[in-house]
Amino acid sequence: MIAVLRIFALAIFAILMFVFGCGYCLLSPRNPKHVFTFGRYFGRMSKIFGMKLELRIPEDAYSRGQHVYVANHQNSWDLFTISSAVTPKVVTVGKKSLVWMPLFGQLYWLTGNILIDRANRSKAVGTIDQVVTSLKESDVSVWMFPEGTRSRGRGLLPFKTGAFHAAIGAGLPVIPIVCSSTGGVKLNRWNNGHVIVEMLPPISTEGYDKSNVRQLANQAREQMAAKLEELDKEVVELNKK
């Protein structure tokens, strides 16, 4: 019964977001400010699914300059958890097929996010070049999921290097963001416990280039894997209380 009520609430939310969200975005199509606005709205839905969401974001996170953000990508719950960590003037980079997702896909495009064709390597590489150009010509930051796909309970997957090529090309630091594991969240469970999203310190890209981009990716992954393990242990203890 709980699952049915939540699905109903989600359906209502999706329709409202699509109708009013698209209408709002059409006033200034593909404006980066929309990503921050709707990230907050989606994050508030975590309460509907019985999650106690805790954001750990530095005080200066909302006034920092440009960065390339990298986050772990677990499952569909990311939409209601890690999306809350999006800061102003940040757009995400997602797969092109997202635009065909009913309701969400059209809103995703209108809010100014970047779509890439991951099935076509040459097009994907070209898009990374476009991301670098966009970073150099604007004050917008980008958010990417370096795993390239949802991990679905398999832990932190190996990282692709696209995000790190973009960071090096634009001469920007990388900021990792980690969300504790949400594989145990169930639609039919009233209390789904704590979920922690934490923003880590920036990683400088100075001294890196195409020849050692893998080293940068590995450094970020090691930090994120350690933080994920730490957060998961903390969540276990919090859920016992």
Predicted segments, located by residue:
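Generic preference for hydrophobic
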Residues: 55, 69, 92, 197-199
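Membrane-targeting alpha-helical segments
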Residues: 1, 45-48
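Membrane-interfacial terminal anchoring regions of lipid-handling membrane enzymes
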Residues: 1-26, 59-62, 215-241
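Non-catalytic C-terminal accessory region of glycerolipid acyltransferases
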Residues: 125-241
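A short beta-turn/loop motif at secondary-structure boundaries
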Residues: 58-63, 189-191
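Aromatic-capped interface at the extracytoplasmic side
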Residues: 28, 53-55, 186
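Catalytic core of membrane glycerolipid acyltransferases/transacylases, capturing the structured
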Residues: 17, 21-29, 33-35, 48-49, ...
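N-terminal nucleotide/polyanion-binding subdomain common to many enzyme families
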Residues: 38-45
